Amino acid sequence: MKPEETGGSVYQPLDESRHVQRGVLQALGAIQILNGILILALGIFLVCLQHVSHHFRHFFFFTFYTGYPLWGAVFFISSGSLTVAAGRNPTRMLMQNSFGINIASTTIAFVGTVFLSVHLAFNTQAFKGCQSSPSPDVCISLGSSSDGLVSLMLILTLLELSVTISISAMWCLGNVCGLREAITSPPNSVESGILPEGSDSENLNTQPQASEE
């Protein structure tokens, strides 16, 4: 289908799709921020339980001492904030920074998934010692609470993993992966989405594209 020219530009008919892409990026970024906040909150609950249950700290030690709820949440909130910013104003710098930190967050989410899975596996073994503990009921209750919090954290981490992969893929489809080559050797403006000199900055490609800084 041949795009119609509007105001002397062939980019105008693509505006609606471009705005949809920006909206999707901002929504995914908001999910990342919410995930980070919830993971941090669950981590705080784990810390509180760990301090209350002096005799049953083995239920909490793995996630607590790895610090995943803290540094994982920081990465997720940061990547979400950059994604929202890049969705609102897709400059080259914001796009590259968002792409880079989302790749890092994908790695962090994968590592967090491993940590939390190991924690749940360890708790399964720790439950077997509850019957021989001084307070079996308290032991089982704390173990169940720990499992519940860690399971929620694991679900949020898996959601974060899927979101970061989706955002990274969107940036790659928007030519961010080859953006450095595009800067040194300007490609066809319609294919890459990088605006030709003198064109209106509002008329961008269907993918989340960079505006001239």
Curated annotation (Swiss-Prot):
Subcellular location: Membrane
Signal peptide residue numbers: none
Cytoplasmic compartment residues: 1-26, 80-97, 170-213
Membrane topology, Extracellular segments: 48-58, 119-148
Gene Ontology CC: one annotated term: membrane
Bilayer topology term: Multi-pass membrane protein
Keywords: Membrane, Receptor, Transmembrane, Transmembrane helix
Pfam families, sorted: CD20
Residue intervals passing through the bilayer: 27-47, 59-79, 98-118, 149-169
Function: Hematopoietic modulator for the G1-S cell cycle transition. Modulates the level of phosphorylation of cyclin-dependent kinase 2 (CDK2) through its direct binding to cyclin-dependent kinase inhibitor 3 (CDKN3/KAP).
Family indicated by similarity: Belongs to the MS4A family.
Description of its domains: The C-terminal region is required for binding to CDKN3-CDK2 complexes and the modulation of CDKN3 activity.
Protein name: Membrane-spanning 4-domains subfamily A member 3
UniProt gene name: Ms4a3
